[in-house]
Each structure stands twice: as structure tokens, then as C-alpha cells.
Swiss-Prot record:
Family in the record: Belongs to the 'phage' integrase family. XerC subfamily.
Example of a GO biological process term: chromosome segregation
Primary localization: cytoplasm
Catalytic residues identified in the record: 146, 170, 237, 240, 263, 272
GO molecular function: DNA binding; tyrosine-based site-specific recombinase activity
PROSITE patterns membership: CB, TYR_RECOMBINASE
Subunit structure: Forms a cyclic heterotetrameric complex composed of two molecules of XerC and two molecules of XerD.
Function: Site-specific tyrosine recombinase, which acts by catalyzing the cutting and rejoining of the recombining DNA molecules. The XerC-XerD complex is essential to convert dimers of the bacterial chromosome into monomers to permit their segregation at cell division. It also contributes to the segregational stability of plasmids.
The protein's name in its UniProt record: Tyrosine recombinase XerC
Pfam families: Phage_int_SAM_1, Phage_integrase
UniProt-annotated location(s): Cytoplasm
Annotated Core-binding (CB) domain residues: 1-85
GO CC, any one term: cytoplasm
Length: 299
């Protein structure tokens, strides 16, 4: 079995020309599978089956391997068996149809309401970039837009009189969202400045040369704003997450938040209920007279 693994690594290096880092990762992952085979008395790669791999991945998961790492291992096994089948050594793939154990879903990072206010109420310098960036920040937080929805936004999608914006979301689905008063004010300041650039199209947010802002440009500007006002990294989706979390915290209306975010499946929206519970738990721990406090003895 060792010689087949060595031959595969040689194939990756010479014919596939993978990087040394990638090659080392493949060798390490497949080496763990080989070690398992030796302990499980699997004497050839032909004898390794899906039940063996299920046992292997379960054991690795119990030992602390993340779902992402296990997915990478299974990908390495599939690539290895594709090679073995092509070389006539095996006629099967034990990893076919096998998925790694699901890990805990990471909670999205958000700003609390005080930090959001600190970001948005920090004061705006009277210049083109500052007013544009303020309008971007306010709209992202006010309406919960995705970055792609913001960059694709055109003038005819804005209705500042009624405080509405129409966006084109995933799957080319449109939805109409409210625009808060602060965002409306910021946009009313920004749009006359935008017109001075002689814009090349109907994009709401443009550069000083009148070109539509792309995702990367907005990410860079938000990162700078976060470091300046909050001393932390800030990305567009953090404002969308904050919008959803704060709205759910205040309204407790999961369906309404789902509609505003444009989620096809409410399960996607339910991640924000975990954030809300975390907030409530923090409030409870700090405010309830019989909550456990750090540094106090149990009575």
C-alpha cells in the first residue's frame, strides 16, 4: 500500500505539478488513512470500503478534526482512487457518496447597536468620498443589502420620496426594501455630488471618475472606515448581519426578517435567532439577581 501512495505522490509532483504545500497536505491526509488501514488490518487499497471510511472519519471527528479538514481528506481519497482506478489497481471509490460529519455552523459576526451607532455617527467630512462612503454605510445597515445588490444598484431602483429601494437578489429575484431616514438623508447629500462626476451609467455609487464602484473598492473603503471609527476590520456583510440581528432582536418576527434579507429558506435566517439568544443570555447574566456571576461563589 505504501508503494502505491508513493507512486501517487510522484504523479502529483511530476505530472500534475502541484505545489509542495499541496503535495504535503495530500501525503499527510492519505498517510492518516493508511495508518488507519494498518490498524484495521486492511491489507490493500482494494479492500478499503465505505464502512471503513465512515469509521475513520468518525474517529477523526471525535479527535477534534473539523468538518472542513475531513472534507479535504475525503477529497484527497477520491483523487487517489481516481488514480488507482486509472492504473488498474482498483475498480471502486470507497469515498463515493460519503460526506463528512456536519460541524457547528459559525455564527456571523455583527456589530452591537452601540458600535453600529459609533460607526455611523462618527461625523462626516465635507468631501466627495466621505459623503459617498456615509451613504454606502447607511444604506447597507438600513436595508440589509448584499454587496452584489449594492454594487448593482441603479438610480431607477431608488425611491427616496417614499423611502424604498428595489434590489435584484440571488436567483434574479427582486424585492422592495424600506430605506431608513438616516440613509435617505445620506443619499440626498450624496446624489448631487454623484452628478458632478458626469457618471458613465446609472449606478448609484460611482468613483470620482464616474465609474460604477466594484465590490473590491467598497470592501477597501469599509475596511478603512472600520479601522478609523471602531479600530476593527469591517466588511459589507457584517452590516447586513447587524441589520438582521438588530431587527430580529427588536421585532421577534423571523418571517419578516427572512423577507427583508431575501432568503429562500427560513433555515438560513434562523442563524440570527442564535445571535439573539446570545444577546439575551448576556443580558440575563448581567442583570438577573440569581444569575451566576464570574468571581462569585455558588451558594
Amino acid at each position: 500500500m505504501d508503494q502505491h501512495l508513493d507512486a501517487y505522490c510522484m504523479h502529483l509532483r511530476s505530472e500534475r505539478q502541484v505545489s509542495p504545500h499541496t503535495l504535503e497536505a495530500y501525503r499527510r491526509d492519505l498517510g492518516k488513512v493508511l495508518a488507519y488501514c494498518q490498524k484495521a488490518q486492511v491489507s490493500s487499497w482494494s479492500d478499503l470500503d465505505i464502512q471503513h471510511l465512515r469509521s475513520f472519519t468518525a474517529r477523526q471527528h471525535q479527535q477534534g478534526q473539523s468538518s472542513r479538514s475531513l472534507a479535504r481528506m475525503l477529497s484527497a481519497v477520491r483523487g487517489f482512487y481516481k488514480y488507482l482506478n486509472r492504473e488498474g489497481i482498483c475498480q471502486h471509490d470507497p469515498a463515493n457518496g460519503l460526506s463528512p460529519p456536519k460541524g457547528e455552523r459559525r455564527l456571523p459576526k455583527t456589530l452591537d447597536t452601540d458600535r453600529a451607532a459609533q460607526l455611523l455617527d462618527g461625523g462626516v467630512e465635507d468631501d466627495f468620498l466621505a459623503h459617498r462612503d456615509q451613504a454606502i454605510l447607511e444604506l447597507l445597515y438600513s436595508s440589509g443589502l448584499r454587496l452584489s445588490e449594492l454594487t448593482g444598484l441603479n438610480l431607477d431602483q431608488l425611491d427616496l420620496r417614499d423611502g424604498l429601494v428595489q434590489v435584484l437578489g440571488k436567483g434574479s429575484k427582486t424585492r422592495v426594501l424600506p430605506v431608513g431616514s438616516k440613509a435617505r438623508q445620506a443619499l440626498e447629500v450624496w446624489l448631487p455630488l454623484r452628478a458632478l462626476t458626469n457618471p458613465q451609467d446609472d449606478a448609484v455609487f460611482v468613483s470620482q471618475q464616474g465609474k460604477r464602484l466594484g465590490p473590491r473598492a467598497i470592501q477597501v473603503r469599509l475596511k478603512a472606515a472600520g479601522e478609523r471609527e471602531l479600530g476593527q476590520n469591517l466588511h459589507p456583510h457584517m452590516l447586513r448581519h447587524s441589520f438582521a440581528s438588530h431587527l430580529l432582536e427588536s421585532s421577534q418576527d423571523l418571517r419578516a426578517v427572512q423577507e427583508l434579507l431575501g432568503h429562500a429558506d427560513i433555515k438560513t435566517t434562523q442563524i440570527y435567532t442564535h445571535l439573539d439568544f446570545q444577546h439575551l443570555a448576556t443580558v440575563y447574566d448581567s442583570a438577573h439577581p440569581r444569575a451566576k456571576r464570574k468571581g462569585t461563589a455558588d451558594d
